[in-house]
Structures are given as structure tokens and as C-alpha cells.
Swiss-Prot record:
Cellular component, GO annotation: cytoplasm; endomembrane system; intracellular membrane-bounded organelle; membrane
Listed name of the protein: Vesicle transport protein SFT2B
The encoding gene: Sft2d2
Pfam annotation, one family: Got1
Function: May be involved in fusion of retrograde transport vesicles derived from an endocytic compartment with the Golgi complex.
Segments on the Lumenal side according to the record's topology features: 58-63, 120-122
Cytoplasmic side: 1-36, 85-98, 144-159
InterPro entries to which the protein is assigned, alphabetical: Vesicle_transpt_Got1/SFT2, Vesicle_transpt_SFT2
Similarity comment text for this entry: Belongs to the SFT2 family.
Keywords (A to Z) from UniProt: Acetylation, Membrane, Phosphoprotein, Protein transport, Transmembrane, Transmembrane helix, Transport
GO biological process, one term: vesicle-mediated transport
Modified residues (N-acetylmethionine): M1
Subcellular location: Membrane
Length: 159
């Protein structure tokens, strides 16, 4: 369990500088981090489910769905900040191996919200689907060799 804590919180090495001790002293306890992660992730799922239920509201449903679905996904990704910390999360998001996936996810978030508020509401539904695909690809980047396995599966299916 301690190894899991160290990996998730970004304390892989035992390098203890003065700055790391200050950050550690002012940070949340492991139990509080887990509770924050669970609460934020649960709120994210609740927003996504609520958005799905609002999809069937006449006239305004599609826009509400896009907004709540996007907010739910943002909260779900944001929940991992509790586990790793904000700086470690940002560093990992923009590592070269997942840079394109991160940009696609953020672009889909922005395009979904723009289409829900400014453009055609039907376009928001398409961007929500693209958002799900981009989030899946982004999530797979955290699992070693998962994206390679998915690529090979699609290559076999399409061949």
C-alpha cells in the first residue's frame, strides 16, 4: 500500500530536498486525498448521468446534456489531482507520450461547450462522442502498452 501511495503521489524517489519537505508538510494526508478523489470523481459521474437524463428535456435538453456531460468529465479528470497533486498532474498530462491526447481532450471540451452555447446543439452531441473517444485514448496512455494493444486490435479487425 505504501508503494501505491508513493507512485500515485509522485514520490517515486527518496530525494528529500527542503522544498519537498515543505510541500509534504502543507499537503493533504493520504486519507484526505482518497476522500477528495472519491468525492470529486463521484460528482463527475453524477454530472454526466444528470446530463444524460437532461438529454430528453424538450428544446433545452441537448445543450444541458453537453454542458453537464463536459463538466462531469472535467471533474472526473480533476479528481486525480487529489491523488497526484496539481503540478504532478499537469506534468504528466503534458508529457510527450500523452501530449496529443491531452490536447484532443481539451479541444473536445472547448468545442463541446462552444457548440452548446454558441453554435448548433446537434453539433454538441457529436463533440460529446468525440470527447468520449478522446478521453478513452487519454486514459489508455496511463496503462503501459494499452494504446499499442488497441491499435493492433483495430488493425486486425479492419484487415
Amino acid at each position: 500500500m505504501d508503494k501505491l501511495k508513493k507512485v500515485l503521489s509522485g514520490q517515486d524517489t527518496e530525494d528529500r530536498s527542503g522544498l519537498s519537505e515543505v510541500v509534504e508538510a502543507s499537503s493533504l494526508s493520504w486519507g484526505t486525498r482518497i476522500k477528495g478523489f472519491i468525492a470529486c470523481f463521484a460528482l463527475g459521474i453524477l454530472c454526466s448521468v444528470l446530463g444524460t437524463l437532461l438529454l430528453w428535456v424538450p428544446r433545452k435538453g441537448l445543450g444541458l446534456f453537453a454542458v453537464f456531460y463536459t463538466l462531469g468529465n472535467i471533474m472526473s479528470i480533476g479528481s486525480t489531482v487529489f491523488l497526484m497533486g496539481p503540478l504532478k498532474q499537469l506534468k504528466r498530462m503534458f508529457e510527450p507520450t500523452r501530449l496529443i491526447a491531452t490536447i484532443l481532450v481539451l479541444l473536445c471540451f472547448a468545442l463541446t461547450l462552444c457548440s452548446a452555447f454558441l453554435w448548433n446543439k446537434g453539433l454538441a452531441l457529436i463533440f460529446c462522442i468525440l470527447q468520449s473517444l478522446a478521453l478513452t485514448w487519454y486514459s489508455l496512455s496511463y496503462i503501459p502498452y494499452a494504446r499499442d494493444a488497441v491499435k493492433k486490435c483495430f488493425a486486425v479487425c479492419l484487415a
